[in-house]
């Protein structure tokens, strides 16, 4: 089963369907897309409450390389999560390893 499907609706307008995910990734992905590119509009919605499918809608002034935008957004999220992990582990170490 595919995990991701990109649909170009019209010039500069894309729908990214993500299977097996929910609001957690939807919120993170939209915010990351906004950070790494300059969309006119970016939001997501759950397809149905009983299905783990989200659709991310992104609109730009003109066509973009949406795969490159998603790569940059993924890199950004990995960087943020890595930074959080590093800070968390440093804090644990300062407290003597307890959590």
Swiss-Prot record:
Catalytic reaction annotation: RNA(n) + a ribonucleoside 5'-triphosphate = RNA(n+1) + diphosphate
One Pfam family matching this protein: RNA_pol_L_2
GO BP term (any one): DNA-templated transcription
Function according to Swiss-Prot or TrEMBL: DNA-dependent RNA polymerase (RNAP) catalyzes the transcription of DNA into RNA using the four ribonucleoside triphosphates as substrates.
Family, per entry: Belongs to the archaeal Rpo11/eukaryotic RPB11/RPC19 RNA polymerase subunit family.
Species the sequence originates in: Aeropyrum pernix (strain ATCC 700893 / DSM 11879 / JCM 9820 / NBRC 100138 / K1)
Entry's EC annotation: 2.7.7.6
Protein name as it appears in the record: DNA-directed RNA polymerase subunit Rpo11
Gene from which the chain derives: rpo11
Subunit structure: Part of the RNA polymerase complex.
Keywords of this entry: Cytoplasm, DNA-directed RNA polymerase, Nucleotidyltransferase, Transcription, Transferase
Location in the cell: Cytoplasm
A GO term for molecular function: protein dimerization activity
Keyword Nucleotide-binding in annotation: no
Any single Gene Ontology cellular-component annotation: cytoplasm
Alphabetical list of InterPro entries matching this protein: RBP11-like, RBP11-like_dimer, RNA_pol_Rpb11_13-16kDa_CS, Rpo11-like
The keyword Glycoprotein belongs to this UniProt entry's keyword annotation: no
First-level EC class: transferase
């Amino acid at each position: 089963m595919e995990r991701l499907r990109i649909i170009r609706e019209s010039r500069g307008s894309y729908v990214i369907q993500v299977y097996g995910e929910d609001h957690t990734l939807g919120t993170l992905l939209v915010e990351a897309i906004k950070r790494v590119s300059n969309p006119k509009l970016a939001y997501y919605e759950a397809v149905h409450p009983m299905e783990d499918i989200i659709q991310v809608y992104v609109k730009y002034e003109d066509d973009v390389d949406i795969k490159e935008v998603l790569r940059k957004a993924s890199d950004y999220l990995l960087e943020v999560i890595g930074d959080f992990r590093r800070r968390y582990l440093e804090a644990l170490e300062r407290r003597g390893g307890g959590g």
